[in-house]
């Protein structure tokens, strides 16, 4: 079998995951190929501004990885970007127009939108104001699509392995596979830093795939181990243990509650989410069910329950939104002081999210892991969005606003069965496959086959001085690259 990789994201552990999978396929006797960018893309997820030093670092890491693998991977150089392809609009009227743009049957605009939304942390990105960036992102997506498709046809590839699957440098490769009838798989971080997640035929954001994996994991694990490991996921999160990503509650003060918190009231905690990862996903339902968005949901819930002075809601803004100035955060800030029965807890507030959850009558989420956590800790959880635990019955999933309000008003609302939360916790903690060759030292560093995958010393020194020069140029607004 001929397996094709487009390793366009070099930070650890993702490049090392590519290397791990390449080594596996080679060990199984397959032919492995890699389409390598050596600066041809005008922008990418790891190097938005196409800085020469970062580009050189990426190439140096890739070359070292190939050396560690014994030069057994056939490298297919990415062709230079040609003139701007026909069919690209001069500008896109808004982010929705960008999302719907297709080129030769491939919805490359969706991948460009996903990358740009993440870059600017703005789900309603002004595509007119950022016209130049939009054009570069679309051009990068088209170039990945065209180059990867040509490479796959040239070698007659049987399978492709792609990182993540939502960005402009990865999703177009999936489009190419689908047009050619080639199978593909994607990879992402696993449940801990010592694991990687390799998914056949779909992407990490696929809710149905998650449901199948959760069920298979639970059935294949002895009951006592499943219960213990499922519980560990939740106790570790509450203890701020960082398994696969950074803890957003680490800076909060344990047991701290909002000022004037009244335990005698029927308190409802609402935990929102960061929208940037969910706003441009192919095949994923709208982030919020029944309502236009989370702001609409919060305002309608608060306004409808205003007739009962014993009900008070607390909106905990996700800590990941701290310091941002975006459409989402501006609209959330506008809720401050608007309703007497709503307290808004800012993202950088030291209020303990777990203490707030613990002392609430019910918890409302839009996809946050807190929805499953609330169930585990014995609290009624109401899910108004979509989450990887959608099918686990660990949260109430109302079908309309009236049902939502009925759940909120109900005194003594029982939590959903804890078993669903345990199933999800087991899967999330043990999600993926243990690395055999990569040894993680932290969430973003490690060694592969006992060696650090980094450029050789002379090149590292050059990269260091180039970065110093680039940072100085950026401070003085005198950049000479990517114009």
Where are the regions a protein language model picked out?
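A donor-sugar binding/catalytic signature common to diverse glycosyltransferases
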Residues: 169, 348-396
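Conserved nucleotide-sugar donor-interacting segment of glycosyltransferase catalytic cores
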Residues: 144-199
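Conserved N-terminal ligand/cofactor-binding loop architecture of enzyme catalytic domains
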Residues: 30-142, 189-249, 441-450, 467, ...
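Conserved catalytic-core segment of nucleotide-activated headgroup transferases in glycan assembly
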Residues: 239-334
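Histidine-anchored nucleotide/phosphate-binding helix
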Residues: 12-34, 174, 291-306
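Nucleotide-activated donor-binding/catalytic signature segment of Leloir-type glycosyltransferases, i.e.
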Residues: 330-347
